[in-house]
Amino acid sequence: MKRTQYKPRITPITRIGKAGFISIREIRVIRGFILLGFLVLACLGCNSPAVNTVATKSGIDMVVIPAGSFEMGSKSGRPDEKPVHTVWVDAFLMDKTEMTQAVWELIGKAEALPNPSHFKGAALPVEQVTWPQAARFCNARSRFEGLKPCYNEDTAECDFEADGYRLPTEAEWEYACRAGSATDYSFGSDGRKLGDVAWFVDNAAKKTHPVGQKKANAWGLFDMHGNVAEWCNDVYDKEYYQTSADKNPRGPADGKENVLRGGSWKSSADAARSAYRLGETPGFSDACLARDAIGFRCVRKKI
């Protein structure tokens, strides 16, 4: 009698009573859910574009901020943060960090711009900067890099079509700070986590700190919360949001104060919120002002 080789028969697993066996159909369903889960995780960052940086001749990298719309202001914030309104912002470039003393001194040598800072250090943010000084530095940096300056230093008017450096508009600043978020801070609304991204009154030990030590926001920008408050190009008006343009707003036509954003090493967690606004005279006429807590960062139009 001829022997045949035994070949075991493989059959699909089926559910047997309460033993918990799983059928082929159920395996396929589970596999589908797993695949869907991976796709969902992959898409969680769809609204947070990959960080695209641009090197500059002056040494501070810039981040390409994508065009888009966002909800500006805060429903639960101070009166000058209301009403919340939808704003469209064109793409632009923003310094990855606050302006450092090293770069200020590099460019300032040829422009008679001495370092005004109270706390000294190459990697520290420059501070004790008036608005006119910040605008003048933007022009100096533009010339240093062969770009067209934006500011008329006699009138403080800004040429937004020039390809040089300028201060961000208030809308650009908040849009970049939020980095796609709609919460109190770029990372959420839990102020207890602010120390992960910011130097503020609770952790700064009464001084500024080297830029870029804390976590960046989703768009790769450092110290948008805390360290030093940052000048914006706009004139401050506590009621401006009631009449603000909905596309690339550039602030009121005139006023006695300019906008500061972001809070500082002296600020509370509340003052470091993304929507928090502060108006200050551009030349530091207020004797009570914390001057060593004010700096800036530059932006450029995206070409």
Model segments located where?
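Short, well-ordered junction/capping motifs at the entry into regular secondary structure
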Residues: 157-160, 198-225, 252
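Disulfide-stabilized, aromatic/cysteine-rich ligand-recognition loop
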Residues: 47-50, 215-217, 252-303
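Intrinsic disorder/low-complexity segments
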Residues: 1-50
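GGW-centered surface loops in extracellular recognition modules
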Residues: 51-66, 162-165
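Short, polar loop/linker segments at the starts of domains and inter-domain junctions
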Residues: 72-91, 208-214, 270-289
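Short, surface-exposed loop/helix-turn segments at secondary-structure junctions
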Residues: 242-252
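Active-site microenvironments of metalloenzymes and redox enzymes
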Residues: 69-74, 87-188, 196, 233-241, ...
